[in-house]
């Protein structure tokens, strides 16, 4: 399947490298506002076509799937345009800010019989499936704790007076939408939507959340999801029951190492060495090859639930976007 890449940032480069590992994918074109950045990406990965106009790339009959790697606030309009042009879409996380936008795009994809995916690593990792399998082994679940704290390479720019898109409310930036989203995907993917959502952010003077703690309440257990772009700490997920616990490191975006711990029993460990994007791209390629719309729609259902939680969290904290 021929891919057109929209955007030239670091995640676009990462995904271009992953696409190259999968024979089913071929990067056919890249679209950038600036010719020079588009040409640089194209040269690095052997991409034959460079566009500076998105509509022109969408009009290219060779493009079958558009990968959208642009600021969060652009995802809705760019995804809709691609679907209307008859293209399958892989949209970088976070999918879109609102439930209404998510519902509209998913309905449009189904109407046009197109594939639509949110690019999110969490659900595709083998250890994520293993964590679900081991839930019964830890007894009654009581606490889930997820931590993703990564000092942003753009945070110093924010402190100096600049407003990078990742810290701009107008671009739907912030720690919740960029990092804590992975924690939400991990939890909601396993347990569905919570009963109650509350978000407790640290706010910068422009109103953006640079870090925060999200609480998700379920009938029999509670989840604490910590996400930060203004400080750093080791990442992890812990699912703690009354008969044991599951530890995942380095966290919800990369379930590389899993350990099942139970008193009086030998630990069960699982470790994978591939990048988390490898599993994401490989599974999407398989879904496309099999024309497995049911798998696509099941993933979109989880995306809808995550968007619902994130929108509720922003409303609870009165973030204003």
What are these regions (language model features)?
Residues 1-45, 319:
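N-terminal Rossmann-like dinucleotide-binding module
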Residues 3, 45-106:
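Beta-loop-alpha module in the N-terminal Rossmann-like domain of NAD(P)-dependent dehydrogenases
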Residues 51, 91, 116-118, 248:
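Hydrophobic residues in well-ordered beta-strands that form the structural core
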Residues 65-67, 103, 283-321:
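C-terminal helix-rich "cap/oligomerization" subdomain common to oxidoreductases
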Residues 104-122, 140-143:
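Rossmann-fold dehydrogenase core element
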Residues 123-195, 320:
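Predominantly a Rossmann-like dinucleotide-binding segment in NAD(P)-dependent oxidoreductases
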Residues 183-253, 282-291:
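Contiguous beta-strand/loop segments that form the cofactor/metal-binding neighborhood of enzyme cores
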Residues 271-282, 298:
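Active-site loop of classical SDR/Rossmann-like NAD(P)-dependent oxidoreductases
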């Amino acid at each position: 399947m021929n891919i057109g890449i929209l955007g030239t940032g670091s995640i676009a480069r990462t995904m271009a490298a992953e696409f190259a590992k999968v024979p089913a994918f071929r990067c056919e074109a890249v679209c950038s506002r600036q010719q020079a950045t588009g040409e640089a990406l194209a040269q690095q990965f052997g991409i034959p076509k460079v566009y500076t106009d998105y509509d022109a790339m969408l009009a290219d009959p060779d493009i079958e799937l558009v990968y959208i790697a642009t600021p969060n606030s652009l995802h809705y309009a760019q995804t809709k345009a691609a679907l209307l042009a008859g293209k399958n879409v892989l949209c970088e996380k976070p999918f879109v800010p609102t439930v209404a936008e998510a519902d509209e795009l998913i309905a449009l994809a189904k109407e046009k019989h197109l594939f639509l995916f949110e690019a999110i690593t969490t659900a595709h990792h083998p250890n994520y499936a293993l964590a679900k399998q081991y839930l019964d082994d830890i007894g009654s679940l009581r606490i889930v704790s997820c931590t993703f704290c990564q000092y942003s390479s753009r945070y110093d720019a924010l402190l100096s007076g600049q407003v990078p898109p990742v810290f701009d409310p107008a671009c739907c930036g912030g720690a919740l939408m960029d990092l804590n989203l992975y924690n939400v995907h991990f939890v909601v993917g396993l347990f569905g939507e919570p009963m109650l959502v509350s978000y407790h952010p640290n706010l910068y003077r422009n109103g953006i959340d640079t870090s925060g703690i999200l609480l998700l309440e379920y009938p029999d257990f509670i989840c604490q999801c910590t996400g930060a772009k203004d400080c750093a700490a080791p990442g992890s997920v812990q699912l703690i029951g009354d008969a044991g616990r599951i530890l995942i490191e380095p966290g919800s975006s990369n379930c590389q190492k899993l350990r099942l711990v139970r008193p009086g029993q030998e630990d069960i460990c699982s470790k994978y060495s591939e990048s988390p994007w490898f599993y994401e791209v490989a599974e999407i390629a398989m879904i496309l090859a099999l024309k497995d719309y049911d798998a696509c729609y099941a993933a979109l259902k989880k995306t809808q639930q995550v968007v619902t939680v994130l929108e509720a969290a922003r409303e609870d904290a009165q973030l204003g976007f």
